[in-house]
Amino acid sequence: MSGHSKWATIKHKKGALDAKRGKIFTRLIKEISIAAKNGGGDPDSNPRLRGAIVAAKAENMPADNIKRAIQRGTGELPGATYEEFSLEGYGPGGVAVLLDINTDNRNRTVSEIRHAFGKNGGNMAEAGAVSWMFHKKGDIIIPKTAAKEDDLMNIVLEAGGDDLNDDGENWEILTEPSAFEAVLEAVKKAGIEPASSSVTSIPQNYIKLEGAAANTMIRLMEALEEHDDVQNVHSNFDIDQKLLEEVAG
């Protein structure tokens, strides 16, 4: 099972804990505001905003919160001005780490992320150092209990998806970013509810980690995930599923 989808599954299992800390809503509000700022406040003509609203509703965010986040993005309401950019670095064993950042204070965020890397066995890298190791893909994770392989394969192919992979307890659908919405809609129309879905950065190759290096990498991932300005963490580690599930527990 590939590292990025294993970690996505772990994050899904830990979602209730994250929600208690308010981090899910904070990140979704930032994403909605930036999407509205960059592409306008109409979700019908702004695919990124449409996806952010779908994600917010899936987490039971109140409609008023969504509306205010859109209005802050379009400038109809006052609020913080967010900047989005990527940060790159390395974990133990030369594992690549790519971060999606949304922040209202670049200097503060860069300093804090640099500290998180250094404290947890990693180090920051220059722009472009690891981003070339990843490519953008639509990534839809579905529990095997929710769909049979043949049925799901037919849906994926008809909707324009690229691949259907066996990831242990789950099926993983990969799409081109342009086909992501159509494939996700087709899956849901068939009555299948994904465990998670997003357009994400997927590594081209993976680095196997075991023992102390694996534990250090998990600590680094958790430290980065904890930061309020980090929207997403992408990495090319491959760590045993059992160890990751112990962390999720």
Positions of PLM-derived features:
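N-terminal cationic and glycine-rich segments that engage phosphates or anionic surfaces
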Residues: 1-125, 130-139, 208, 249
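Positively charged, low-complexity, intrinsically disordered RNA-binding extensions
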Residues: 139-249
